[in-house]
Design a protein with these regions (language model features):
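Glycine-rich phosphate-binding loop of nucleotide-binding enzymes
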Residues: 70, 77, 84-92, 179, ...
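Switch/coupling segment of Walker-type NTPase motor domains
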Residues: 71, 103-114, 128, 132-134, ...
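Conserved structured core elements
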Residues: 81, 149, 172, 328, ...
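Loop-rich catalytic cores of soluble enzymes, especially ATP-dependent carboxylate-amine ligases
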Residues: 389-439, 454-455, 463-466, 471, ...
Length: 541
């Protein structure tokens, strides 16, 4: 009896139809419908590792490098050519398995940080009025330029790998090669770790400069994911031509490259927008042999069409050399392209160029987009809104290495490298940095602490009347107000006397009629240990 009971208990009970329906419903709920339902769901990455590797969908992994600007626009033609050729070499080093994203971001900084960097704190002495006046001057100069904006540049490369271990090894090799290329160009570059990449994403999703607060040890305790620390309060993509991100309105457009010739000034003009802009270039290399085969097939097709047109001309009784002009143009361009790929170390790339504009209101957004479109029109290109694809456009405009907009234009290496990401190097240091005027190209403030340089010495050169003395007096005043440095002025013409008097300095007059004097014969017999002081003084005189 007990054995039969045990057999009955070991039998698996069949699920009822109702229970099966409940299980299927739970499975469907866990899988979801593939659509984002929260702001976090819209951000297209699965995991961010501490070392800076980001796992995307479909077994893809990316890493990000931040690089600084260099003085390209002010460089001599030979230097510009060298930078351009170095860019070409870097792009050629990426094979067809590597996707590259070049991100140029201009966004508003935290206002308090900028204010504190130029504000001279009062010290409750006789010079607080001068400090207040000098701070007011600095704030005026700050408003003249775009120092309220932070401009950062990133290069993100993406590969496919079966697991994180193999991805980490290959990404490390690509990282080393890319850093070497930036070193040749002359641009300082560094690899971002996971927290730094999250901070960049947070800055894009919170464009007003909100502070980023995050630590890896907070995740297990809070039960949150990294997306919870970077996501905005909301996304709204209901409108086909724009979107809302928190309290901001935004629009993503793509650049139709219709110009026969491209200029290296285009990206620089985009980045000069007053209210911030984000420009992204998604670059995908094509296998060299496949590119040559494809172009040869196109040339064959064009030749076949040309033969058909010639046959039609003979049948119609007119000159067979008269063929459609477009056919002749395309045939010549295809042959030139084939020659470049075969003999000029050129490769083929697929390029997607996206422009992201953000503003506080719809009207301001339309003005920003119109301004960006005017820049594109200046270079015979067309900036077109991504209708009903704003979400994909936004997520393709953050430096994750994910391109969800496959509107691509085929370009050679030289044509791709024409989009030079460099303009002019800015100098805006914190601490005891002194004001040295405005950048001649960007009109931004120059704040520099020369004591941090290898050689802090300096000369003020210029033609008569160009402001050399004024520059020296301004630097003296600035150093007096914010540092504890000793200031010594040798002034044969006595033009600094009023400044020294206002700053309550000591004036020593050395002349034939003055009571102060310097005795070159004065000697201290104890100042030298090994040599004879009298002999040294005699030799000096």
């Amino acid at each position: 009896m007990s054995k039969e009971k045990g057999k009955t208990q070991n039998k698996k009970r069949k699920l009822t139809r109702q229970e099966k329906k409940q299980i299927d419903a739970l499975i469907r709920q866990a899988k979801g419908d593939g659509k984002p339902h929260t702001a976090q769901d819209s951000i297209p990455f699965e995991r961010m590792y501490k070392d800076g590797i980001c796992r995307l969908a479909n077994g893809r992994y990316s890493k990000c490098i931040e690089f600084e600007d260099i003085n390209y626009q002010l460089a001599q033609p030979d230097d510009k050519t060298a930078i351009f050729e170095a860019l070409c070499d870097m792009y050629n080093s990426f094979d067809a398995s590597i996707s590259v994203q070049l991100s140029l971001i201009s966004r508003h900084a935290n206002k308090e940080d900028f204010k504190s960097s130029i504000t001279i704190a009062p010290q409750n002495d006789d010079f607080d009025s001068i400090r207040a006046e000098y701070t007011e001057m600095l704030q005026t100069q700050l408003e003249r330029g775009n120092n309220g904006l932070i401009k950062t540049k990133f290069l993100t490369f993406t590969i496919e790998a079966k697991d994180i271990k193999s991805a980490r090894a290959r990404l490390a090799r690509i990282e080393t090669d890319t850093l070497n290329h930036f070193k040749v160009i002359g641009a300082a570059a560094r690899v971002l770790d996971g927290k730094q990449r999250l901070e960049v994403l947070h800055g894009l999703f919170h464009p007003d400069g909100e502070r980023f607060n995050f630590a890896w040890e907070w995740l297990p305790v809070s039960g949150l994911s990294v997306k919870d620390f970077i996501a905005p309060s909301s996304f709204r993509f209901g409108d086909g031509r724009m979107f809302q991100m928190g309290g901001k309105f935004g629009a993503v457009s793509f650049l139709q490259i219709a110009a026969p010739e491209l200029s290296d000034r285009m990206l620089a003009d985009f980045m000069e927008a007053e209210n911030g802009i984000v420009v992204n270039l998604h670059i995908q290399s094509i296998d060299h042999n496949e590119a040559i085969k494809t172009i040869k097939r196109k040339i064959t097709d064009l030749d076949r069409m040309k033969i058909e047109e010639q046959k039609k001309a003979i049948r119609s009784g007119y000159d067979m050399d008269i063929i459609p002009s477009d056919l002749a143009t395309y045939g010549g361009e295809a042959k030139n392209l084939l020659r470049d790929l075969q003999s000029r170390n050129e490769r083929m790339f697929l390029l997607t160029l996206l422009v992201l504009n953000l503003a506080d209101t719809k009207q301001k957004l339309d003005n920003e987009v119109f301004g960006a479109a005017a820049i594109a029109q200046k270079y015979n290109c067309i900036l077109t809104r991504l209708d009903y694809r704003q979400e994909q456009g936004l997520m393709s405009s953050i430096p994750l290495g994910e391109n969800l907009i496959h509107i691509q234009r085929g370009l050679t290496t030289s044509s791709t490298a024409v989009f030079v990401p460099f303009t002019v190097q800015e100098l805006f240091q914190s601490g005891e940095a002194l004001y040295y005027g405005l950048n001649a190209l960007s009109n931004n403030m120059i704040l520099c602490d020369r004591k941090k340089l290898k050689n802090p010495n300096g000369l003020i050169l210029g033609t008569p009347g160009s402001g050399k003395s004024f520059s020296a007096k301004r630097e003296i005043t600035n150093a007096f107000l914010i540092t504890a440095d000793d200031i010594i002025i040798c002034d044969p013409e006595a033009e600094y006397y009023p400044l020294v008097g206002r700053l309550k300095g000591q004036v020593i007059k050395v002349s034939q009629n003055s009571t102060q004097y310097i005795n070159p014969m004065d000697i201290n017999l104890n100042y030298s240990e090994g040599d004879t002081p009298i002999a040294l003084k005699s030799d000096f005189i």
